[in-house]
Amino acid sequence: MIVAVGSTNPVKVEAVRRAFSLFWEADVRGVDVESGVPKEPFGPNAIEGARNRARNALRALNADFGVGIEGGIFHLFGKYYCAGFVWIERKDGVHSTGMSGWFECPEAFLPDMLRGRELGDLMARLSGNENIKREEGAIGFFTRGAVKRVDLYTHGTLMALAKFIAAGRWPR
C-alpha cells in the first residue's frame, strides 16, 4: 500500500508512518504539493488546506491513500488554539477527517499571526531553532519535550483513520 503525504516535512511524514504502521504495512512517502491556503491558515482554511494536500498527494503519487495535515489556528470560546487538521482520502474517493490535540495559542503571537506570520517562524525566533517546525514544534518547546509535534500529528492521523480502521464496524 502506498500512502502519499502532502508534505515533505519529516514530522508529518513520520506521524503518518507511525499511524498507518499500527494497522498495515505501508510505504509512506512525502511529496511537495500546494495547499492552496495561506501559510498560517485559520479555521476552515486549515481544513481546506488539509483536503487539498491529501488530494494533490494522492494524484501526484498515484497512491492508495493521500494524507493532508494542515496546522492551523482555530477560534473558540473567545480564545485561539493551535491544532492540526488531518484529511485522509482513499483512491476511491472515500475520505475521513480528524484533528490533533489542541493547545492555546500564545496571545503575544496573535497580532503577527493575524497578519499572516507563520507560527513556525515565530517559534524559530523565540526558541533560536530555525528548524523547530520540522522537529519538536511549538508544543515540544512549550512542554519541554513531553509532547512533540509528531505526537500531535500521529494522534490526529489516527483520529482520521478511525473510519478506515473500523471497516465493517463503521455505521452507514
From Swiss-Prot:
Disulfide bridge partners, by residue number: none
Cofactor(s) recorded in Swiss-Prot or TrEMBL: Mg(2+); Mn(2+)
Signal peptide: none
Pfam families: NTPase_I-T
Residues that, per the record, bind Mg(2+): E34
Protein's job: Phosphatase that hydrolyzes non-canonical purine nucleotides such as XTP and ITP to their respective diphosphate derivatives. Probably excludes non-canonical purines from DNA/RNA precursor pool, thus preventing their incorporation into DNA/RNA and avoiding chromosomal lesions.
Database matches in HAMAP family: Non_canon_purine_NTPase_YjjX (MF_00648)
Family per similarity comment: Belongs to the YjjX NTPase family.
Protein name: Probable inosine/xanthosine triphosphatase
Organism of provenance: Korarchaeum cryptofilum (strain OPF8)
